[in-house]
């Protein structure tokens, strides 16, 4: 990274941490900001293999949950960090109506079906942000399983639905504007295969 990029990235990290504040990851005491930083790190690593991944994609990964979970508007993101960052964050976020029903069990599948439908026609950069998000989440699930935690209790959906969702994401990331040949897609595929082959009785 060039000096000016490091400065901008440092400012962006500070902004993200301020907005997520003291929030924690669902069902744990782990600071929430560790997740967007993990997503950013995945994209930075991918950038070393693909020079087309620019600063906007990295920032979108860092900010991907600001609209959905920290109530930062897409317009605010655009004003502070530009149109492309805002576009990618919007593509990775649930719409307002579904966002309000986030913690309602009956709405889980409806929300995920909406996300999958958007993924069908998504551009490569949007898919990269979403792939990095899912990879960081999948790694967290895998760590919890290895630690002996009943990770599936954190979800507002049964095991089979979660499995369906992650496997559907893999299929859609491979279709259309495919990112199948990226390092992070291959890592996500490995994680998903590992997570869902573990018997549920061994997850807690």
Outline where the language-model segments fall:
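Active-site helical microenvironments for divalent-metal-assisted chemistry
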Residues: 1-204
């Amino acid at each position: 990274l060039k000096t000016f990029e490091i400065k901008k990235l440092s400012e962006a990290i500070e902004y993200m941490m301020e907005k997520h504040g003291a929030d924690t990851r669902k069902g744990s005491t782990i600071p929430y900001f560790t997740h967007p930083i993990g997503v950013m790190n995945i994209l930075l690593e991918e950038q070393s293999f693909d020079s087309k991944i620019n600063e906007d994609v990295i920032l979108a990964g860092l900010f991907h949950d600001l609209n959905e979970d920290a109530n930062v508007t897409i317009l605010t993101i655009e004003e502070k960090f530009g149109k492309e960052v805002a576009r990618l964050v919007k593509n990775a976020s649930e719409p307002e109506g579904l966002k309000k029903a986030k913690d309602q069990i009956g709405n889980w599948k409806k929300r995920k079906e909406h996300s999958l439908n958007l993924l069908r026609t998504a551009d490569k950069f949007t898919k990269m942000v979403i792939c990095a998000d899912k990879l960081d989440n999948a790694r967290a699930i895998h760590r919890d399983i290895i630690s002996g935690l009943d990770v599936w209790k954190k979800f507002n959906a049964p095991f089979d639905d979660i499995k369906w969702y992650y496997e559907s994401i893999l299929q859609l990331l491979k279709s259309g504007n495919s990112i199948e040949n990226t390092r992070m897609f291959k890592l996500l595929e490995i994680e998903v295969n590992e997570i869902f082959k573990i018997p549920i009785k061994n997850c807690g």
